[in-house]
């Protein structure tokens, strides 16, 4: 028994909405970074689902998904490095307190 495409799309929509809500409402930059990663994972679910159920099924969606995972890992590494440097300089990682470039 196969899972229909609509189930994958609803799941990806829920993941994306949860990530978007967290990215827009939370004030902790680590949580915002995690929510952005959640949104990227929703995109990966869509890529794989459309690859499986598309007009010409193949591995294109999986390849794009692996590329997206690689980019997300690099983004997370750079984001965490920036957060560590920010914490060393400002002693905080809350968005409200680090919104300016001034020391």
UniProtKB/Swiss-Prot annotation:
Keyword check for Transmembrane helix: yes
Keyword Ubl conjugation annotated: no
Xref: Gene3D superfamilies: 1.10.287.3510
NCBIfam families: PRK05715.1-2, PRK05715.1-3, PRK05715.1-4, PRK05715.1-5
Chief site of localization: membrane
Reactions performed catalytically: a quinone + NADH + 5 H(+)(in) = a quinol + NAD(+) + 4 H(+)(out)
Annotated protein name in UniProt: NADH-quinone oxidoreductase subunit K
Membrane topology designation: Multi-pass membrane protein
Keywords: Cell membrane, Membrane, NAD, Quinone, Translocase, Transmembrane, Transmembrane helix, Transport
Entry EC number(s): 7.1.1.-
A Pfam match: Oxidored_q2
Cellular component terms (Gene Ontology): NADH dehydrogenase complex; plasma membrane
Domain of life: Bacteria
Residue stretches spanning the membrane: 3-23, 30-50, 66-86
GO terms for biological process, alphabetical: ATP synthesis coupled electron transport
InterPro entries, per the entry: NADH_UbQ_OxRdtase_chain4L/K (IPR001133), NUOK/Mnh_C1-like (IPR039428)
Compartment(s) where it occurs, according to its Swiss-Prot or TrEMBL record: Cell membrane
Gene behind the chain: nuoK
Protein task: NDH-1 shuttles electrons from NADH, via FMN and iron-sulfur (Fe-S) centers, to quinones in the respiratory chain. The immediate electron acceptor for the enzyme in this species is believed to be a menaquinone. Couples the redox reaction to proton translocation (for every two electrons transferred, four hydrogen ions are translocated across the cytoplasmic membrane), and thus conserves the redox energy in a proton gradient.
GO terms for MF: NADH:ubiquinone reductase (non-electrogenic) activity; quinone binding
The protein's assembly and partners: NDH-1 is composed of 14 different subunits. Subunits NuoA, H, J, K, L, M, N constitute the membrane sector of the complex.
Family: Belongs to the complex I subunit 4L family.
